[in-house]
A protein has these predicted regions:
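C-terminal transmembrane bundle of multi-pass solute transporters/carriers
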Residues: 1-140
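Intrinsic disorder in cytosolic terminal tails and internal cytosolic loops
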Residues: 136-183
Length: 183
């Protein structure tokens, strides 16, 4: 039942996320979902009934879906169409590498220290990840960015396609002309 309720929480969140993402930016939504996961995992230490466990797994399903589902939007916003397949593959591989570490860790901690205790280190890991995301993901994550290309010749095709006096703006994605996000 717990996994079923996790899935139910996840699906219900996925159904309402399009409306939520129309009103709030991806950063706020995804960090809120991660905060739900962090709080839920810390609360897991105090679960003392089966019904409490079921409620917890429902809430964790919500947090998981809200924190993970918009990932595809970020990849589409951040990369040119030529690079998206590689980024989606990298995200898939990275998420599975994280699971490859987390699943055995949860099993080992549960076996050696108990299931309730295991919620605490998992909550700490989630809190650290959320804190890093909060620090490195800019609050003003604009898609159109004013920038310059000091490294390109003045007759470069990219520069000629934009009106500029040394600087120009357009939907900014990582590609061969934009190797890094501007500071």
């Amino acid at each position: 039942w717990a996994f079923g309720l996790f899935g139910l929480g996840s699906m219900l969140s996925a159904f309402i996320l399009p409306n939520v993402l129309d009103k709030f930016n991806d950063r706020a939504v995804m960090l809120s979902g991660t905060a739900v996961l962090v709080v839920g995992l810390f609360c897991g230490f105090f679960i003392n009934s089966y019904n409490g466990l079921l409620v917890l797994w429902f809430v964790l399903g919500i947090g998981y879906s809200v924190s993970q589902t918009p990932t595809g939007r970020l990849i589409r916003k951040s990369a040119s169409s030529e690079n998206r397949t590689s980024l989606f593959a990298a995200q898939f591989a990275f998420s599975h590498a994280c699971w490859l570490i987390a699943y055995p860790l949860v099993g080992w901690l549960s076996t050696n220290f108990g299931t309730l205790f295991t919620f605490v280190p998992m909550a700490v890991i989630a809190l650290v990840a959320m804190s890093i995301a909060f620090m490195i993901w800019p609050k003003q994550d604009e898609s159109v960015i004013v920038h310059s290309h000091d490294d390109l010749p003045v007759d470069h095709e990219h520069l000629l396609s934009h009106n500029h006096d040394g600087k120009h703006s357009h939907d900014y994605v990582i590609d061969e002309n934009h190797q890094r996000w501007p500071k």
